[in-house]
Amino acid sequence: MKKLLLIPIVAILTACSSTHLTPDKAIVVQPLAQATATPERPIKVTVMRDYGAISGGARQYHILDNGKIIASLYSKEMTTYYAEPGNHALSVGFGKNGEDGRINFSEFKLGEEPELHVGWDGVNLYINRMK
């Protein structure tokens, strides 16, 4: 009986977490800022919103880079923006100022193309650099 009870619990917890998104399955949206490369901002940064079935799935997530809103993404969406080399405080949250979310500190270097994934792990928001 205990094992039978575990099946729906595991199913619910699995549905609450996000599933990793790949670029070929993503819906591309334009960034709200820094949409084109410039000599000051040559680094192409891709942000993908992983998708979840229940918890956090319908909410819009706001992506900020050093306090500046870059994009607002729904489930299965991705955006690409251009950033300057150096240290960046990347945050994801439900509010447009990002105070209710998570922060990832990362250094962007010339010649690299960082890829970030944001989503919901069943308990909290996350923002992870994948490359």
Regions found by a protein language model. Give the residues of each.
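Short loop/turn and low-complexity linker motifs enriched in small/turn-promoting residues
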Residues: 16-131
